[in-house]
């Protein structure tokens, strides 16, 4: 869902003021690939942290559910990171309502997996406590927070 929403992103007003990219440089440049790897590492680390926390608190079912939920939410939040080079504070969270709707629909679907008994059975989802759900949300938000802080610092808007 976030990928479709990003496709609906309004064009950057400063796009024509930027110098053209080097035609000899591939689409996947070294700096861009580095950003992708770093962002993937952050999401992966948050997911592994959630799994470890869940395993220590309730075994494999809780660990898997926390990891699944953290990864799902982190990817939904990451859609906002992929909107452009500017931070969310510069772009405005609501400037692309498709991204907000994608987040909402994704959260509703994830909650269905976590709280609808039939879907819990299909996905082998464990019952999470309130503190575990809070940990999932905070863990999923952490990569986006780091990426947004980096964007603000690199743009000089922090």
Predicted regions and their residues:
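C-terminal transmembrane helices and immediately adjacent loops/tails
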Residues: 1-158
């Amino acid at each position: 869902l976030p990928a479709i929403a990003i496709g609906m992103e309004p064009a950057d007003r400063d796009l024509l003021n930027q110098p053209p990219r080097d035609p000899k440089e591939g689409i996947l440049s070294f700096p861009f690939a580095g950003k992708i790897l770093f962002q993937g590492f952050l999401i992966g680390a948050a997911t592994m942290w959630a799994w470890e926390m869940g395993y220590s608190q309730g075994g494999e079912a809780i660990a898997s559910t926390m990891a699944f939920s953290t990864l799902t939410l982190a990817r939904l939040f990451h859609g906002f990171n992929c909107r452009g080079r500017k931070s969310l504070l510069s772009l405005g969270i609501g400037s692309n309502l498709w991204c907000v709707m994608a987040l909402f629909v994704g959260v509703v679907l994830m909650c269905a997996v976590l709280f609808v008994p039939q879907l819990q059975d299909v996905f082998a989802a464990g019952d999470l406590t309130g503190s575990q759900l809070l940990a999932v949300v905070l863990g999923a938000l952490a990569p986006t927070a780091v990426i947004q802080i980096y964007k603000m610092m690199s743009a000089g808007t922090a």
